[in-house]
Amino acid sequence: MPLVMRKAAKRMAEDKRVDLLDRILAAHQSFYDIRRDCLFEGRTFPAFAEYHTYGEKYVLVKRAKLWEVNTHDFMFFECVDELDEARLAEEISFMKEKAIRKVNAGPNHMSSALSLVIIANHATEEALKLAKKTRFHKEYRFGFRGWTDLRLAVVDLSLSASKGVVVNNAGKQLKEVISNNLALIEQGPQTRKVQE
């Protein structure tokens, strides 16, 4: 393949990754605080989104509180050209060791989700298998201060929308939004509606 065609193909693949990332972020912008080119623990991510919710129950007046809870979701996004098993293992390790520092398991903490969405032009079969079998669950003070789960989604743009999105067990919520937006990209530029 001539150099000009290879450069054009690479640019199109990059555009598809960025287009999918933009669509996913647009689907989450109503509820999440989104930052582009986010620097965290010495690494720059193309995007980072966080969601916080607070709930409480009280009797008659707000001072007579029965309970209160906080839940959080921290979503890291990464765009890569090629994803192999070693690179995915590094990303998972980063989430378990460094991204978990985002979690503040205070007295009213109920749960936090650490989410990692990796958009790749191509992912190896081994990487997809590792993504599917990845498990991480951490409880704080025997569960009295809540828990954290790792939600992982790997998007292989070389596959169809139905087969190209692989998630772990905790990441099942991510699959529908990502698959729907990937299907819209595959339909072509005439479709501009963001799928939530």
Report the location of each language-model feature.
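Exposed acidic/polar residues on beta-strands and adjacent loops within beta-sheet cores, strongest
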Residues: 57-58, 63-69, 121, 125-131, ...
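Active-site-adjacent loop/helix micro-motif of nuclease/hydrolase catalytic cores
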Residues: 82-97, 101, 125-129
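Structural motif
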Residues: 77-82, 118-121
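Charged, structured surface patches that assemble and position nucleic-acid processing machinery
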Residues: 133-196
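Short, surface-exposed beta-edge/turn micro-motifs
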Residues: 71-74, 111-114, 150
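Nucleic-acid nuclease catalytic cores
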Residues: 106-132
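Catalytic micro-motifs at enzyme active sites that drive phosphoryl/nucleotidyl and oxygen chemistry
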Residues: 63, 102-106, 138-142
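N-terminal, charge-rich interaction modules
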Residues: 2-79
